Amino acid sequence: MKKLLISAVSALVLGSGAAFANSNVPDHAFSFEGIFGKYDQAQLRRGFQVYNEVCSACHGMKFVPIRTLADDGGPQLDPTFVREYAAGLDTIIDKDSGEERDRKETDMFPTRVGDGMGPDLSVMAKARAGFSGPAGSGMNQLFKGMGGPEYIYNYVIGFEENPECAPEGIDGYYYNKTFQIGGVPDTCKDAAGVKITHGSWARMPPPLVDDQVTYEDGTPATVDQMAQDVSAFLMWAAEPKLVARKQMGLVAMVMLGLLSVMLYLTNKRLWAPYKGHKA
């Protein structure tokens, strides 16, 4: 029983954190971390606004149902707004009729494919080693040290000017101190061919600038704030039931604890008269 209780506690604590094991990514405190952590509804709404107005141009979320925007524990947007929002997205081919129709709230978010489009963000925030995601999601990024809300946040704010070792004329590539698997020019490598820069170059340009969106709640739209908000939103998109699972884990811990106490007291009452007496 003690081992079972310890296992339950360990599973809850390990499952509640969202940090992926990557020493190159500084930790960032999110409201949903920890045993008692939960999503900040206002932050999820701001994050959805950033995704919708900025990120969705190049990144899809094809595994996320649009209707979940109205669910409890998430952005909890008005169902009427969600229906209208879905109808304004890219049209979809109906599976039954084969004809083009407006997207419904029961459909998934659109996907983005083609030259210049980025990876799907449906489960990018799942920070689990060995998690490869649904088929076709391109989640091999996780095996390369990418993924998790901390990574997304640090990546978005990680764009910097080219280091001094970079040659002139690196057009179409952008240096990011968090991005570890991109290209590195020979001038930024040592004699052994090992890069001397902390980060590398990505094809994706810096996605955010200050005041790029206007938050409805009046929150200043700094790059740092928008990066935090969209990272939290993508975590919710990947783990919409995270808080519910934590609550179930807490209930299980309490019940296991009570059961352990009851078993101890029962054992003591039944066997105490016989213990210590020699035959």
From Swiss-Prot:
The keyword Heme applies. Its main location: membrane. One of its GO terms (cellular component) is plasma membrane. GO terms for molecular function: electron transfer activity; heme binding; metal ion binding. Residues 1-21 form the signal peptide. Binds 1 heme c group covalently per subunit. Keywords: Cell membrane, Electron transport, Heme, Iron, Membrane, Metal-binding, Respiratory chain, Signal, Transmembrane, Transmembrane helix, Transport. It is a single-pass membrane protein. It is found in: Cell membrane. The chain crosses the membrane at residues 248-266. The keyword Magnesium does not apply. SUPFAM superfamilies: Cytochrome c (SSF46626). It comes from the Bacteria. Heme c binds at residues 55, 58-59, 204. Pfam families: Cytochrom_C1 (PF02167). InterPro entries: Cyt_c-like_dom, Cyt_c-like_dom_sf, Cyt_c1. The main subunits of complex b-c1 are: cytochrome b, cytochrome c1 and the Rieske protein. Component of the ubiquinol-cytochrome c reductase complex (complex III or cytochrome b-c1 complex), which is a respiratory chain that generates an electrochemical potential coupled to ATP synthesis. c1 functions as an electron donor to cytochrome c. This is Cytochrome c1.
